[in-house]
Structures are given as structure tokens and as C-alpha cells.
Amino acid sequence: KFHPNEAIEEAYRAGQRVFGESKVQEMTAKYESLPKDIEWHFIGHLQTNKIKYIVPYVALIHGIDSYKLLAEVNKQAAKAGKTVNCLLQLHIAREETKFGFSFDECREMLAAGEWRKLNHIRICGLMGMATNTDNDEQIKTEFCSLSSFFNEVKAKWFADAESFRELSMGMSHDYHEAIAAGSTLIRVGSKIFGERNY
């Protein structure tokens, strides 16, 4: 996130092909100027009015935090003639600043079943961010709760969906705990690129 193209090109030359960005404008500019075999993941809070800009090329949207957003991604994807891969974001941290469904809100949305009519999105898993704390036990507990919720959701609503397999959790400071709890996608930036410039 927010790292210059040169830093991404260096990682690209080392073999990295999946990159994440949290700002639509930033990601679109990078998509346009960097190699086209890069797989772009959108990992920030996505506003409905910005979806149309990333739908043509985004590989995975990590932060779907409402049915309204999911429906809008579907609408824009239909216009672009695409199916967009999405992760549902769960609020697992003890911080108000983080976005996401509560476990109950997510259960309600999935049980309601409206999402099944959205033919241009594919729900591929869940995403969550742990509390930004030095308390390793708390981080482990939060990741384990999301991992166990993932298993519940998979069994209830996606048992036959091979594509429902991603659990995006863990960043530079807590990815060890995330992997131990079952993460399949870690979002590591500063450990690779150094601290970013805001």
C-alpha cells in the first residue's frame, strides 16, 4: 500500500505476482503502469461509487462489509461482463475503527439467500483484522474465532463450493499467529517493503 512502483517492480523481478492496495486511485494508477500479469487485490474499505474503477481488473476484493456493497460489485461486474471474486469482511477486533460484519450479521445475510441471485460475484472466503495490540493471546483468540466461523460458514452455505477456501488474515506484525490459526492469505507490506510513506 502506497509504495512506489519501483519497490513493486523489485518484488516483481524477485517473483512476486500478487499485490494489494487499499486506495482505488492508487491501485488503478499502478495497474495501468505495471506488468499486466500482476494479480491485484483490493484490501481497503471500498466505497460503492468507486467500484466501477477497479472491477475491470481486480482479482480479489478482500473487504466486502455489507450486502449493499456486494450487490453493487455484482452490478458493476455485470456491466463489465465479469465475475468478481470477493471475501466477506468480519469485524473481529476490539476497535471501532475496523469495518466488517459481526458474525450474526454475516449469518443473517447468508441465511437470507439474496446473495445467491448475484451471478457476477463469487464469495471465496472471509477476511478479518485483529486488534492492533501487543497482546499475542488476544490476537490468537481473534484469529481462531474467525477461523472457526469460516468452518461454520463453509459447512452451512458453501459445502460444495470449491472456490470458498480463502481466509485472509494476518499482517506484518501478526502473520505468524494468523498462519497458525489457518490463514490462507496474509497481507504483508512493511515486512517486505519497509514502512510506507503516507
Go through each PLM region and give its residues.
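Short C-terminal tail/terminal secondary-structure segment
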Residues: 188, 193-198
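Conserved alpha/beta-domain cores
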Residues: 2-173, 179-181, 193-195
